[in-house]
Amino acid sequence: MSRANVLSLYRRVLRIARSWKAQSSIPKDTDTEKKYITQEARTLFRQNQQITDPESIQRCMEECEARIEIGLHYRNPYPRPTYLPPMGLATQKGRKLRAQQRLRKQAKPVYLQSQDET
């Protein structure tokens, strides 16, 4: 991915933030959500600006696109939570914690890849 594509995506997020209207139509909520979108974009783009691997850049851009689409569809800028119980994924016999951690990482949706594991 080229620098121009990344900057174009960043500008798109900022344009969405500028024209965002909260689902509740309350001006305070709209301002809060606009600030969240802008701050989240700034934080994640700056956090990832040192990435040079094309595959990693592509994954970050896919995550951004997914979050944009989900946010626009549901009119909610916040990432959707995932509900996976700590040891809720099935494993084969003999494999315990490492397998669970790997399965949890694989089960994480693309739009939450940048979120810390809680």
From Swiss-Prot:
Region of interest (Disordered), ranges: 91-118
Biased composition (Basic residues): 93-107
Residue intervals passing through the bilayer: none
One Pfam family from the record: Complex1_LYR
Coiled-coil blocks: none
InterPro entries associated with the record: Complex1_LYR_dom, Complex1_LYR_LYRM1, LYRM1
Domain of life of the source: Eukaryota
Family to which the UniProt record says this protein belongs: Belongs to the complex I LYR family.
Protein name in the entry: LYR motif containing protein 1
